[in-house]
C-alpha cells in the first residue's frame, strides 16, 4: 500500500512540475515579446461590462480591416461568417495619428515585413454568391484581453469606458508572436493614468 501511495504521489508531483514549467514558459515567452518586440498601436473600444471575468482583465475590441489580395494564399477559407487563424502584416507607423495599420492577411506569413501569427480573421463580402467568390476584405481580430490588478479592475474599467474614444491598445510583435502589452488613455499608460486620477481626483 505504501508503495502504491508513493507511486501516486510521485505521479502527482511530476504532473504539477510539468504544469508549473509550462506556465513559467508562457510567462517567459510573453515577457520576451513584451519587452523586446516591435511596438504597434491600434485604436480600441472598451470591454463588455457584462463579461463574467470582469475583475481579472479588461476586454477590448480593435476594429481593423484589410483589402483582399489574390496573391495571398487562402486555401478553402472563404466562409463569410467563420473566423479562421490568420497571419497579418503590420506597418507599425503606417496609419493615421501615429497608429499602426494592417496591410495584408493570409494563412501564413508571405514575403518581407512585420508579421504576426495566431490572430483571427473573417472574410467579408459585399455580395456573396458562393464559396468560390473572392472576399472584398477581411475583418481582423487582435488579442483582446488585458490582465490587470484585480483590486483596481473596477476603477480601471470605469475609467477605460469613460475614455474609450481616446483609448489605444499597445501591442508588441516579435518572431511572429503578438501580445497586448498596455492600454493608453489620452496617450498615458493605463496604470499611470489611474495614479494621476487618484492623486488629482
Task: Locate the predicted segments by residue.
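Hydrophobic membrane-insertion alpha-helices, especially the h-region
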Residues: 7-29
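Structured domain cores in non-transmembrane regions
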Residues: 66-127
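Short extracytoplasmic
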Residues: 42-74
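Aromatic-capped interface at the extracytoplasmic side
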Residues: 22-44
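Short, Lys/Arg-rich N-terminal segment immediately upstream of the first membrane anchor
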Residues: 1-6
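Extracellular/lumenal and peripheral-membrane lipid-interaction modules
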Residues: 29, 51, 63, 164, ...
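Extracytoplasmic/periplasmic terminal helices and flexible tails
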Residues: 100-104, 116-201
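Short nucleic-acid-contacting surface segments enriched for D/E, G, S/T with interspersed K/R
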Residues: 53-56, 74-86, 155-167
